[in-house]
Amino acid sequence: MILQEQRRLRLWLYKSSLFISVLFLIGFSIVLPVDSIVQAIQSENNGFNTIIVIGSLAVFFVAAVTILIGRMLLHKSCLKDIPRRYIPVTNADLPHKSSRKMVIHNMERSKKLSGLFKTPKDPVIHPGLEPPARCDDPNTPKILPEYLNYKICIKSATDRLKYYGLFLNSASDDVKSSQTFTDLVKSQFIKGNHNKRQVQRAKDFIELYERIRFSGDEVSRSEFIQFAENCIYFSDLMITMDITKVGLGNISTRSQLSFNIAGSSVDRKLRKLNTARSNQISRLSSGQYPDITAFRYDTSNSDYHRQETDEDDFALDDMDYFPSVPPYMIRRNSTNTVSMRIPTSNSDDQYNLGFNEIGDEDIQNNDQIRRYMSNTSKTDSFKTVIHNG
C-alpha cells in the first residue's frame, strides 16, 4: 500500500512539473513575437514593421520545430536502449511477485510446447513436395529425398527430350522438334503393338503424364511413383525390343547407361546381331538349326536388378515384342549378362554349337555349354529365367 502511494506521488510530481515547464517554455517563447508586434505597431515605417513581424514569427516557428524534433530524437534514442525481445520479469519491472511467477511459468510452458509442436501428431503430407522424415508416415518406406519437387522432376523428362533428344533415357538422332512426349509414347508402344496389356499401360501412361503436366493441380506422391515406375518399365521395354520392329525407326537403343560390348560401339554390335539374326533365318529355311547365340553386355553403370511379381509386370516377360523364341537371361555377376536362346530339348545330338567372340572371356568348348544348358533345359523355352550371381 505504501509502495503504491509513493508511486502515485512520484507520478503526480512528474506530470505537474512537466506541465509547469511547458507553460514557462511557451510563455518565454511567445514574448519575442509579441514584443516585436507591439514595437512594429508603434513605428511609422510599415516596411520595417512587416519585416519585424514576419521575422519574429519565423524565429518562433523554427524554435518550436527544433524543440519538437529534438524531443522525438531523444525519445527514439531512449527506446533503442531497450532490447526488442525484452520481457519484464525482474523485480523493477514487475514488483508483484505472483505476476512474475505467472510470466516465468508460461515462458517455460511455451518452450515445452514449441518442442512438441515441431513434430506433428499425424503425418503431414502435402501434394507437390516430398515431406521430411519427421512429418512423413512412419509406416511408409522413405525412397525419395526430402523436399523433392515432383512436378519439376517430371518436367525434366520433357526438357531432356526437347533439348537433348533423350526419350526415356535413350538417345535419338531423328526426333523431330514437333514431336511431343505423348507422340513418341504412341508411336513406340501403341502403333503396331499387338500386346493389349502394353497398349493399355501406354495409354494410362499418357493420361497420367498429361494430367500431371497440364491439369494445374499439384502432383501427389502416388502419381509421381506411378510415373517413375512407368518410365522404368518402358525404358526396359525399349532395351529388349527388336530394333527392326516397325515404328522404332526414330528411336535408337543407345541407352544412356553406356553399354559397351567387347570394346566396340553399340551400333556395330547391333549390326552384328542383325546379321546373326538374318543368318539364323537363312539356316532355318535350309534345315539347319542354330542352337545357341551368345553375346555379352558390359553393364557397369547399372545392375538391372528386377524382381518378378505375380502380375509378370516387367518388360522381359512381354513375349509379343520378340520376333523369335525369346532368350534365357542368365545373370553371372554385377558387371555382365550372357543371353542364350536354347531349344526345349536337351539331347546332345541336336546341338550344333556356334559362337561369336565376346570380349575378355570366351566360351571355348562344348562341355562348358552343356553345363550352361543343364541349368536351363528343364525350363520351357518360352519363359525367362534370371539367375543372380
Curated annotation (Swiss-Prot):
Compartment(s) of residence: Membrane
Domain of life: Eukaryota
Keyword match S-adenosyl-L-methionine: no
Residue ranges, Cytoplasmic side: 1-17, 71-389
Extracellular side: 39-49
GO CC annotation, single: membrane
Topology in membrane: Multi-pass membrane protein
Keyword rRNA-binding tagged: no
Keywords tagged on the record: Membrane, Transmembrane, Transmembrane helix
Principal location listed in the UniProt entry: membrane
Residue ranges crossing the lipid bilayer per the database entry: 18-38, 50-70
Assigned protein family: Belongs to the DLT1 family.
Known function: Required for growth under high-pressure and low-temperature conditions.
PANTHER family in the record: DEFECT AT LOW TEMPERATURE PROTEIN 1
Official protein name in the record: Defect at low temperature protein 1
Source species of the chain: Candida glabrata (strain ATCC 2001 / BCRC 20586 / JCM 3761 / NBRC 0622 / NRRL Y-65 / CBS 138)
